[in-house]
Amino acid sequence: MNLIPTVIEQTSRGERAYDIYSRLLKDRIIILGSPIDDHVANSIVSQLLFLAAEDPEKDISLYINSPGGSITAGMAIYDTMQFIKPDVSTICIGMAASMGAFLLAAGAKGKRFALPNSEIMIHQPLGGVQGQATEIEIAAKRILFLRDKLNRILSENTGQPIEVIERDTDRDNFMTAEKAKEYGLIDRVLTRVDEK
């Protein structure tokens, strides 16, 4: 059962009921709280574009609690974050794994955060394919290309040499918030909301 809380707001014109995500969007907060697929990516991209059009000078906060997901869907979010004018601040709540960690590190420099008990995990892309040998070869080349592209971007966003990224993403690599800060995935560990 998917229950989305409703918030009642008192205004000079009376009461207004919002679902919680719409109310947070009013404060330029976007929640990525699920595996990343095309539907989730379209929703996040739409919210980013809407907020950028509404006020191109004001930061957007993207809260991430995601196990990761589709590379192409995640890259749609990543490209939009880079494309729009407002800075996108990223905040890990719970877990940012795989593509979730990639998006966390892609936030505006100096504005990438995690809460103290967050967990961040990086690894190489996963994929599976079946079919004729030629199809398998094409798919293998594509996933190696994607791995190299993701590693290069992660290297740029963390300041880690590409060789370190390649080694550290060879297997699931779990980090505490503090370790993610040392690694360069985030800039600060937050304990209170007013620290941002």
From Swiss-Prot:
This is ATP-dependent Clp protease proteolytic subunit. SUPFAM superfamilies: ClpP/crotonase (SSF52096). Belongs to the peptidase S14 family. It comes from the Bacteria. CDD domains: S14_ClpP_2. Its EC number is 3.4.21.92. GO terms for molecular function: ATP-dependent peptidase activity; ATPase binding; serine-type endopeptidase activity. The active site is at S98 (nucleophile), H123. NCBIfam families: clpP, PRK00277.1, PRK12553.1. Gene3D superfamilies: 2-enoyl-CoA Hydratase, Chain A, domain 1. Keywords: Cytoplasm, Hydrolase, Protease, Serine protease. One of its GO terms (biological process) is protein quality control for misfolded or incompletely synthesized proteins. It is found in: Cytoplasm. HAMAP family: ClpP (MF_00444). It comes from Anoxybacillus flavithermus (strain DSM 21510 / WK1). Cleaves peptides in various proteins in a process that requires ATP hydrolysis. Has a chymotrypsin-like activity. Plays a major role in the degradation of misfolded proteins. Fourteen ClpP subunits assemble into 2 heptameric rings which stack back to back to give a disk-like structure with a central cavity, resembling the structure of eukaryotic proteasomes. The keyword Isomerase does not apply. InterPro entries: ClpP, ClpP/crotonase-like_dom_sf, ClpP/TepA, ClpP_His_AS, ClpP_Ser_AS. GO terms for cellular component: cytoplasm; endopeptidase Clp complex.
